[in-house]
Amino acid sequence: SINPFMHIGSFDAVWRVFDRDKGISVPLLTSYRATFEIGQFTNHILKADNVTQIVARNGEMPSVIHVRDKEKLIGIISEDIGRMRESGLSSVAVICKSAREAAGVFARLKDTHDVSLVGRDDKVFKHGIVVVPVYLAKGLEYDGVIIYDAGSHNYSGDNDRRMLYTACTRALHVLHVYFTGVLSDLIPPLDSGLFDYITIK
């Protein structure tokens, strides 16, 4: 579960409720969703004992993009959305840490893009460009994903690890991780070779 207070660390508790002799536990460790490059990147974030095996479908490397001036972040992301759409990606998600952050990003993007804000009460999958808080993104997938701000002030420690993993694994083809300030230590090291690193002043 993405909720750190509901995460099942061990299935022993489940077996105490159900008869172990009448069931089996089958770990699902093969991913068919993302490209090999995105899968390698996200496996490093999770640091799980059981590493997900990625079905070989190659694509572009994920990008980790440092925006030094936070005031420029929305404008740069807006331009990135435009490039993704022009390249043929039909669904693009800007994934934020919280509902409040998502609402703020949506308010600043809606004048330049035909964008939808995903909320808790939405019953129908929204197509095109969406802004979504990470806790509502689980189970969804998009051609391109933009992580709004993966700075250490937003994602740090094991409680945030699964949230960042969930956010990044929503991407099918393109993953761009933006950050301001200091990069979260949940992201693979700069010398890992798992992503392209870009700095924008």
PLM features: what roles do these ranges have?
Residues S1-K201:
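Conserved helicase motor core of SF1/SF2 NTP-dependent helicases
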